Amino acid sequence: MHSGQNKKMTTVLELRNLTKKFAGDVTAVDNISMSVEGGEFVTLLGPSGCGKTTMLRMIGGFEYPDAGSVVLEGVDITDAPPYERPVNMMFQDYALFPHMTVESNIGYGLRISGIESRQVQHEVGEMLELIDLPGMQNRLPSELSNGQRQRVALARALIRKPKILLLDEPMSALDAKLRQSMQIELLSLHKKIGITFLMVTHDQTEAMVMSDRITVIRDGAIEQIGTPTELYDHPVTPYVAEFLGQSNMIPAVVQRSAADRLIAQVGSNELDVTNATIVGRIDNNVTLCIRPERIRLLESSSEVDTSLEVITGVVQQVLYSGNSLHFTISLDGNRSIHVHHPLNTVFN
């Protein structure tokens, strides 16, 4: 998880009841309201077609909402064209001009704004240092690696010092190893310059690693907003629990409850759990969310600590994944759960 900013932040962006429909009465964004604080790294996370990129495009001015408003630092920019908005967007395909050098690509926005050539060269040089590509100003995009092209696109988006940088799946074209490296570089850059970043991705790990806060989008609506820790440890719906990492969704029946705890019947077992474990409830029927890595395996012959909540089961399958073992455990009532254990902790 990104460390975020310690200083007091102020709201830089507000989306108020934002709605967008396309042909055939398809609702891409459904009455969404949210805010972003200055200096935050916020991610819009969801599967393809959930509306997250449409949200980003409405903030950038590339789409216009059917209802609602986009407010930047207290100013309504809903109907403003892209060139009048103090935001820049880094597109998924980078959109570099193939016939222009690195210097010309990065400095393009400054030149069309009428900035003198000497000043443009100076600022481009600073950007090349910032993105760790000094001396590459005369190269063409075709002479760069994929990661280098991404950095050039990033520098071009940042050189005009936008209030918000919009990132549309910025690492989707990179292989796994380069993607991890670029995540670290992007976070370092965000920390250096302090500009608000708003990123779209479908990659849960990427969102968890990079974000101060994550907005989970489902079918054009917000499912939950929170820090990576809040969303992982305290999902409010089964969808969030299962979208962010693997989860055991266990049906149970409430026997009794008090304060923030309850006794839940799972098959022939009773568990004392916190309300935060519940991700769905209808009357006394609840769904418990328990992460696979937070279950400890004990042999049936072991002496059990009475302070532990215990359910009995039978190991059905064991999979080796390098640094851990993944167990499938069958429970009463034709149910099963998954358990992940580091190699050196199994049955300890």
Residue ranges, per PLM feature:
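ABC ATPase nucleotide-binding domains
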Residues: 41, 80-242
